Amino acid sequence: MNKEQLQQMRQAPGFVGALDQSGGSTPKALKAYGIQPDAYQSEEEMFDLIHQMRTRMITSPAFATGKIIGVILFERTMRGKIEGMPTADFLWEKRHIVPFLKVDKGLQDEANGVQLMKPFPELGKLCEEAVGYHVFGTKMRSVIKQANEQGIRDIVEQQFQWGKEILSHGLVPILEPEVDIHCPEKAKAEEILKRELLAQLDKMTEPVMLKITIPTVDNFYKEIIEHPMMLRVVALSGGYSREQANELLSRNHGVIASFSRALVEGLSVQQTDAEFNAMLEASIEDVYQASIK
């Protein structure tokens, strides 16, 4: 594990960019960027286009301001290159950004008010590959739809079970038990989640990271942020607009952003490089300001 990267993730001001759209969410991301579905004929072409968009973002001067401390990548992006260098190496060596890899394979159908991650027996193999690409950590998402005690316990147990396997490969996991912002008893679900997370953290011997939905009650996750086994807590934008997500985030001290959609809002394939860079820089500045409050 890279000690300098560990220090950066523990205490550097800034936020984590999420560029980990997978097959399912890529058409939506491309459409928002101004590329219609009829512009590509195959999955291969679709992934090439999204890689071009990500390359444009990562190579933009806006990405070199030191305000983004980490970036979450999709598998294909990790295996790809930017300006002739493997993506993770380019991020760290040219941008001083810590690379993470999305490792889940999507969600199971809802049961007990939650969606667990699909089983993934190849997790260890993917972790080894990530280590070979000089990736620092991972991220995996499951979703809480209802304030169901059993379901939430299952979610947290699965996240920590995967997390321990990931740690055994020398990678730092970002656990992401997202609470759906439309959950009818969101505050209650968060109470159960916090209790289960603290119970698991108390049993850990190596620190992990956590990605959460911005809580209903400001500063609700304070004990988790201060827990010795918690490296850093980041927040997802979860369907809120960038303005709304930034506003909510700025009220939660010690939590930094890990936004994807809110980061690319307003970017377009039609923009000149100057327009694109200015828009991206403004987005990064907004998210950064909300993260350091």
UniProtKB/Swiss-Prot annotation:
Enzyme Commission no: 4.1.2.13
Pathway membership, UniProt: Carbohydrate degradation; glycolysis; D-glyceraldehyde 3-phosphate and glycerone phosphate from D-glucose: step 4/4
This protein's record includes keyword Transferase: no
InterPro entries for the chain: Aldolase_TIM, FBA_I, FBA_I_Gram+-type
Active-site residues, Swiss-Prot/TrEMBL: 176, 211
Key words, A-Z: Glycolysis, Lyase, Schiff base
One GO term (biological process): glycolytic process
GO molecular function terms noted in the UniProt entry: fructose-bisphosphate aldolase activity
Pfam name, any one: Glycolytic
The keyword Ribonucleoprotein is annotated on this UniProt entry: no
Major enzyme class: lyase
Domain of life: Bacteria
Record field: catalytic activity: beta-D-fructose 1,6-bisphosphate = D-glyceraldehyde 3-phosphate + dihydroxyacetone phosphate
Family from the record: Belongs to the class I fructose-bisphosphate aldolase family.
NCBIfam families listed in its UniProt record: PRK05377.1
Protein name: Fructose-bisphosphate aldolase class 1
Organism placement in taxonomy: Bacteria, Pseudomonadati, Bacteroidota, Bacteroidia, Bacteroidales
